[in-house]
Regions:
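Short beta-strand-centered segments at strand-helix junctions
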Residues: 1-46, 51-78, 84, 98-126
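Long hydrophobic alpha-helical segments typical of transmembrane helices together
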Residues: 110-152
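Short, charged beta-turn/beta-strand-edge "cap" motif at the junction between a beta-strand
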Residues: 49, 87-91, 133-136
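Short terminal or interdomain "cap/linker" segment that borders an active site or interface and mediates
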Residues: 94-96
Length: 152
C-alpha cells in the first residue's frame, strides 16, 4: 500500500476493482474526495488498527493538467474525455476520463493497477485526448441508446 498526499479532511482508501473483489468490499467508483455513501474498512499496521466508517473507493480514471493546457485543448475542469492509447497488440480507448485542472498540476493521466495492466507497453505510455461529444457526455447513456436503436 502507498500513502499519498495531499492530506485531506477525511481518510480515503483507493483500491483497484480486483482488490475490492478479493476483500469483499463493495466497488464504488468515485472521484478522489467524493466519499459520501462509500464503504469503510479497518486499516491494520504495526502500531495498531484504524477503523474508517467511509472512504473506500475505486478512483475514477482522470487526467491532471494546468489551466494553460486546458485552454490549449479546449477542455474545462471536470469535462470527460476519451484517451486513445497505442501499445503492442493491446491498444485501448479509455472512456469517461475526468479532466482535473489546477495550476499546481502537470499533464498526467492517473489510472489504477487494473487499467494500467490492461495496457501493454514496455516504454513510457502515451495517449491522445479526444472529445467526441459535449462536456456532459455519458458513455453509459450512449451504450443504452445504441442498444435501444437510437443512433447518434
Amino acid at each position: 500500500m502507498a500513502l499519498l498526499g495531499p492530506f485531506r479532511k477525511n481518510t480515503q482508501v483507493e483500491m483497484s476493482l480486483t482488490d475490492t473483489r478479493k476483500l469483499g468490499i463493495p466497488s464504488v467508483i468515485r472521484q478522489s474526495g467524493d466519499i459520501e455513501g462509500t464503504p469503510g474498512c479497518i486499516l491494520s499496521g504495526p502500531y495498531g488498527d484504524i477503523e474508517i466508517p467511509k472512504g473506500v473507493i475505486v478512483a475514477k480514471r482522470h487526467i491532471h493538467m494546468t489551466p494553460d493546457e486546458s485552454l490549449a485543448l479546449h477542455i474545462k475542469d471536470n469535462d470527460e474525455v476519451f484517451v486513445l492509447t497505442k501499445s503492442y497488440g493491446r491498444a485501448l480507448i479509455y472512456a469517461d476520463v475526468v479532466v482535473r485542472v489546477h495550476r499546481n498540476y502537470h499533464l498526467a493521466m492517473h489510472v489504477d493497477t487494473d487499467e494500467a495492466n490492461a495496457f501493454n507497453s514496455d516504454t513510457e505510455p502515451y495517449g491522445v485526448i479526444v472529445r467526441f461529444f459535449d462536456s456532459n457526455f455519458n458513455t453509459d447513456k450512449w451504450i443504452e441508446d445504441e442498444l435501444s436503436g437510437i443512433r447518434r
